[in-house]
């Protein structure tokens, strides 16, 4: 049976819980980080998710709202 990859979008990506979820998802081959978003005034907007979790860039930027996040992914 073929294993499926679950795509996730994380809200509050720059917060403590958001970073923890992103870090755990990054290490799990069954999960693909499809997007992440934060409040528009958060300094993490525009940064790569990999930077938030202390890894190399993964080409997933932090967006300022959910709609933009969904449209990009």
PLM region spans:
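Glycine-rich, highly charged phosphate/nucleotide-binding loops
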Residues: 51-71
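Conserved N-terminal Rossmann-fold NAD(P)-binding element of oxidoreductases
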Residues: 8-12
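NAD(P)-binding Rossmann-fold cofactor-contacting core
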Residues: 26-54
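N-terminal Rossmann NAD(P)H-binding glycine-rich loop of SDR-like oxidoreductase domains
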Residues: 14, 18-22
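A short, basic/flexible loop-to-alpha-helix module at the beginning of a structural domain
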Residues: 1-6, 67
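Fold-independent oxyanion-binding glycine-rich loops
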Residues: 13, 37-40, 65-66
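Conserved beta-strand segments of alpha/beta enzyme cores
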Residues: 7, 32-35, 59-61
């Amino acid at each position: 049976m073929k294993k499926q990859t679950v795509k996730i979008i994380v809200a509050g990506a720059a917060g403590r819980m958001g970073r923890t979820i992103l870090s755990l998802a990054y290490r799990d081959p069954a999960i693909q980080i499809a997007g992440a978003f934060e409040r528009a005034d958060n300094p993490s907007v525009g940064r790569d998710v990999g930077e938030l979790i202390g890894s190399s860039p993964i080409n997933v930027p932090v967006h300022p709202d959910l709609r933009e996040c969904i449209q990009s992914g």
